[in-house]
Amino acid sequence: MKERALQLVRESAPEARRNVLREYLQSHVLFSLQAGRAFEQLAFVGGTALRFLYALRRYSEDLDFSLERPAGYRFQRFLDRTERDLMNAGFDVTMHPCEADPMHSAFIRFPGLLHEAELSPHRTAKLSIKIEIDTRPPSGAGLEATVIDQHFLLALQHHDLPSLMAGKLHALLTRPYAKGRDIYDLLWYLSRPEPVSPNVLLLRNALAQTDWAGAQVTALSWRAVIERRLHEIDSTSAADDVGPFLESPEERALLTRKNVLAALRQGRK
């Protein structure tokens, strides 16, 4: 399995190699979680879910989940299974978990792998993947199950697209700093050939849970709320954040306030 990861790196364009390696490892972690029956309790969410399930054209760093069925949930059990599977596949692995309330997280680190893949001159360089599980997610999400072939055959429970969009809008409205990844993902949602609208119930519950002080969001007002937020963001610096993760680096030039506002307003017609 490790040799397959290194082969993928060798076959990739130089600028994509670190992302390709990370994505293979993400797939391996998802496969281990699936084998441990994690998706009976967890739903896959966030940017990596968008990439794996809906072919988002940007790479992502973290694996994010929502705990939908808490009965019998034990975070450490999933980590133990994942660590064992990765080590059996030939990877050196260290786990660094944190079970703070309400977010359970763990950094899975792969010491020496970047050097072995000729992506770093330093033997001690570490590639890491962060797993994060929201153990008290807001209510109202729609759930779906999808089977995909992403290096491994994966059967994933996940939030549906309107609920994933609600999660993205919540991040955009509540982060203390702007992430270019949020802007890119918003533009992706707004420019889809098949229109998608956010799960407003989930968005409202998420905003209430994080004590958001803005006006109540509705199916009619969410675009205006997002438009106000976009005027607060420095789109140039935000675009710098997402550049290294884009499949097509030239898309970075599209991440302007003008373009995002145009897509946002177009949906009102």
PLM-predicted stretches and their roles:
Residues R51-Y59:
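Short glycine-biased active-site loop of nucleotidyltransferases that positions the nucleotide triphosphate
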Residues V45-T48:
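Glycine-rich beta-strand-to-loop/alpha-helix junction loops that act as flexible
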Residues S66:
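Glycine-rich active-site/cofactor-binding loop and its immediate structural neighborhood
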Residues M1-A43, L53, R69-K269:
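Structured mid-to-C-terminal alpha-helical surface segments
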